[in-house]
Amino acid sequence: MKRQKRDRQSRAHTRGYQAGISGRSKEHCPYQIDAIKSQWLGGWREAIEDKQQGLFK
C-alpha cells in the first residue's frame, strides 16, 4: 500500500518547528504563500515556547 504524502501545510508546520528547535530565526522562513508561511511560523513559535519551557536544550 502506498503511503500518502502529508499536505504542504502540515509539512510547513513541522519544518517550522524543527527550525525553531535548532535556533533559526523566523526570518529564515522559506515559504512565500501566506497560508503556508503562517503554518511555518506557527510551528516556529511552538518550538520557541517549548524551548523556553525547558522541553529542549
UniProtKB/Swiss-Prot annotation:
InterPro entries linked to this entry: Ribosome_modulation_factor, RMF_sf
Comp. bias regions, Basic residues: 1-14
Keyword check for Cytoplasm: yes
Keyword terms, alphabetized: Cytoplasm, Translation regulation
Localisation per UniProt entry: Cytoplasm
Disulphide bond pairs: none
Gene3D superfamilies: ribosome modulation factor like domain
Annotated segments matching region Disordered: 1-24
Keyword flag Coiled coil: no
BP terms from Gene Ontology: regulation of translation
Cellular component GO terms held in the UniProt record: cytoplasm
Main function: During stationary phase, converts 70S ribosomes to an inactive dimeric form (100S ribosomes).
Family according to the record: Belongs to the ribosome modulation factor family.
Name recorded for this polypeptide: Ribosome modulation factor 1
Organism: Colwellia psychrerythraea (strain 34H / ATCC BAA-681)
